[in-house]
Amino acid sequence: MRRDSDMASHIQQPGGHGNPGPAPSPSPGPGPGPGASERVALKKEIGLVSACTIIIGNIIGSGIFISPKGVLEHSGSVGLALFVWVLGGGVTALGSLCYAELGVAIPKSGGDYAYVTEIFGGLAGFLLLWSAVLIMYPTSLAVISMTFSNYVLQPVFPNCIPPATASRVLSMACLMLLTWVNSSSVRWATRIQVIFTGGKLLALSLIITVGFVQIFQGHFEELRPTNAFAFWMTPSVGHLALAFLQGSFAFSGWNFLNYVTEELVDPRKNLPRAIFISIPLVTFVYTFTNVAYFTAMSPQELLSSNAVAVTFGEKLLGYFSWVMPVSVALSTFGGINGYLFTSSRLCFSGAREGHLPSFLAMIHVRRCTPIPALLVCCGATAVIMLVGDTYTLINYVSFINYLCYGVTILGLLVLRWRRPALHRPIKVNLLVPVVYLVFWAFLLVFSFISEPMVCGVGIIIILTGVPIFFLGVFWRSKPKCVHRFTESMTRWGQELCFVVYPQGSLEEEENGPMGQPSPLPITDKPLKTQ
């Protein structure tokens, strides 16, 4: 009965006015419940090391073990393929610099969604949120989970593809395990991220070390200039763009730290520091991992391989070749954890702004974790794995993802124009967003020309959010029966998950971490020119 009495003092009564927006903070209940002695809010438990592992862990998933084949296929030579990997890291660095400025100018969790909502208004932010929650992150999580299960099951089925049912069951078991971990403790989740990020870096360090040993022994024929730039097909701008898109998939996840800004210790310092440490490190690791691949395999061998890292291990590691599939499995396990951690904060931020049901803006009374948002992310991913063709959906996801990146960085220029006097602890050179947007526009135009169906479906997915926005957010005078239903469901969900609205988090956003005014108002309307 102790648990029920504590919960009763924290049950929230959502207002019946139907206005979207941040939910009110609860009043502490009587007695020694958690609200009376300690504020219920998201805790600042992510330090610099954990922040770096979130970025590195989300970027390094299965991409570096799979993408080299696609990059080489469209580049036409070893030398140009290596150039594409360096270029991908450079463009990612430009984008991350822009996100660092936005992250300290708009110190709110939610990443792209928070920035687009703040700069362009509620509709634009909702469309980004809708596409992310509906398809982008559930599909990415499903693909990473399926990759994890396939590599774990590979030793059990060495001569054939693992059964689809076994892969799905193992994927869902992994997903539910990590959902439970993230629901139980932020500290547990970040420790898992640190451990598995360290593991995947050790695995890639092994590949790079073996590659350097090969070079010192003189086995680098494919890297000699005469061979490295021996093209087996005539290079073109179109093929180079496709190669870059293949490589950019391996860099996806670089913006995820911005989703958890409010849980960072001293975000104005640690957000840019983590970005400046992580992106160059990942670019270095990716480039020299590919150099190592080419010391063991010819371009033809690499193109014929379905799992480049596994082939590398079989050729050079001998008895220890089992290390490679295990490394990929560990890498994807950490990737699932990172995606769950950050995508749940996106749901949390969207609900707090009134763009998703208010129940998703609640956290556990004692654990201070966003359990409802985590359960929604887990459930949406499970549905995609059961009924969706994940590898077809990922094509649409890539287009939507890149579209969101460009719109967000365009928002940086809009913010510079509308609020020139805004205090910016970090202010990048204007050429940084301009160069990034030039690359972005080029890839977007080329994508429309080469894959009009994929781009068209991606835009349709985004636009399906327009009627949902007007029905669920813009229409405020809903019938009373709708309010009664949502209130009863919210109360039932609170009792089931033992959650309440966070206390004090909104006030901190409005007043700043040290009682100073926040640089931007909390609103879902576009900023006005001053």
Swiss-Prot record:
Membrane topology of the entry: Multi-pass membrane protein
Induction details: Up-regulated upon adipocyte differentiation in response to INS. Down-regulated by treatment with rosiglitazone.
Compartment(s) of residence: Cell membrane
GO molecular function: neutral L-amino acid transmembrane transporter activity
Classification via InterPro entries: AA/rel_permease1, AminoAcid_Transporter
Single GO BP term: glycine transport
Keywords carried by this UniProt record: Amino-acid transport, Cell membrane, Disulfide bond, Membrane, Transmembrane, Transmembrane helix, Transport
Matching Gene3D superfamilies: Amino acid/polyamine transporter I
Phenotypic effect of disruption: Mutant mice develop hyperekplexia-like phenotype due to impaired glycinergic inhibitory transmission. Administration of glycine and L-serine reverses the phenotype.
UniProt main location, coarse: membrane
One CC-aspect GO term: plasma membrane
Tissue: Highly expressed in brain and lung, and to a lesser extent in placenta and small intestine. Expressed in a subpopulation of astrocytes enriched at glycinergic synapses in the spinal cord and brainstem (at protein level). Expressed in OLIG2-positive astrocytes of the lateral globus pallidus (at protein level). Expressed in CD34-positive, DPP4-positive mesenchymal progenitors in developing subcutaneous adipose tissue.
Keyword Isomerase: no
Region annotated Disordered, chain positions: 1-36, 508-530
Positions with biased composition (Pro residues): 21-33
Membrane spanning residue stretches: 46-66, 78-98, 119-139, 192-212, 274-294, 316-336, 368-388, 394-414, 430-450, 454-474
pH dependence per the entry: Active from pH 5.5 to 8.5.
Reaction catalysed by this enzyme: L-alanine(in) + glycine(out) = L-alanine(out) + glycine(in); L-serine(out) + L-alanine(in) = L-serine(in) + L-alanine(out); L-threonine(out) + L-alanine(in) = L-threonine(in) + L-alanine(out); L-cysteine(out) + L-alanine(in) = L-cysteine(in) + L-alanine(out)
Subunit structure: Disulfide-linked heterodimer with the amino acid transport protein SLC3A2/4F2hc.
Functional note: Associates with SLC3A2/4F2hc to form a functional heterodimeric complex that translocates small neutral L- and D-amino acids across the plasma membrane. Preferentially mediates exchange transport, but can also operate via facilitated diffusion. Acts as a major transporter for glycine, L- and D-serine in the central nervous system. At the spinal cord and brainstem regulates glycine metabolism and glycinergic inhibitory neurotransmission by providing for glycine de novo synthesis from L-serine and glycine recycling from astrocytes to glycinergic motor neurons.
Family designation: Belongs to the amino acid-polyamine-organocation (APC) superfamily.
Alphabetical list of PANTHER family matching this protein: AMINO ACID TRANSPORTER (PTHR11785), ASC-TYPE AMINO ACID TRANSPORTER 1 (PTHR11785:SF73)
Name assigned to this protein: Asc-type amino acid transporter 1
Lineage of producing organism: Eukaryota, Metazoa, Chordata, Craniata, Vertebrata
Protein's gene: Slc7a10
